[in-house]
């Protein structure tokens, strides 16, 4: 029987025609979204701003490197690309995929083209086309647009499934803090 470490791996992630990265990297600056303030159908003041820099989007370069840590039933996905999000986890907030602290982070299933959970130990290649599904959710991640934002996001909100491309860099990958783990 495989251990959690043996089912864990490090990979870069992309999409069919491009790669995936955080909005502040995509934009080259903070990704601020402005929403007008309305009350009772009337404009009531200055637009409210929200920083969406930590949410994922599409990007041609550089590659985003992730650590997929198996947790017994699904994967917790840690960010391994150097920068402000290193060590954080991919998680869902308000239906959008972004970088968040690891405590209570969302776990994900790898879903194959037939709609089944894909055990990584049965994959013999280092290139993998896969869907990501929030564990316990019926759907898979997809691209999503918010009405008050110019950005494209990844979401768990009932959209057309988005296939991700993984390039596996290392299998049987330990936690950074436990390199001697079996």
State what each model feature region is.
Residues 1-182:
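Lectin-like carbohydrate-binding module/patch detector with strong preference for beta-trefoil
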């Amino acid at each position: 029987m495989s251990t959690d470490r043996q089912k864990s791996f490090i990979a870069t992630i992309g999409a069919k025609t491009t790669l995936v990265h955080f909005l502040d990297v995509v934009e080259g600056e903070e990704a601020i979204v402005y929403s007008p303030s309305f009350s009772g159908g009337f404009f009531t003041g200055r637009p409210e701003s929200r920083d969406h820099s930590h949410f994922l989007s599409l990007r041609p370069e550089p590659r985003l490197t992730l650590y997929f840590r198996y947790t017994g039933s699904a994967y917790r996905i840690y960010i391994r690309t150097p920068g402000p999000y290193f060590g954080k986890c991919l998680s869902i907030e308000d239906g959008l995929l972004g970088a968040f602290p690891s405590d209570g982070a969302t776990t994900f299933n790898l879903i194959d083209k037939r709609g089944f959970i894909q055990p990584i130990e049965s994959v013999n290649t280092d290139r993998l086309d896969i869907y990501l599904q929030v564990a316990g959710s019926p759907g898979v991640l997809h691209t999503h647009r918010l009405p008050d934002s110019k950005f494209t996001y990844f979401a768990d909100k009932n959209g057309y499934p988005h296939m991700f491309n993984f390039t596996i860099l290392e299998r049987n990958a330990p936690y950074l803090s436990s390199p001697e783990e079996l």
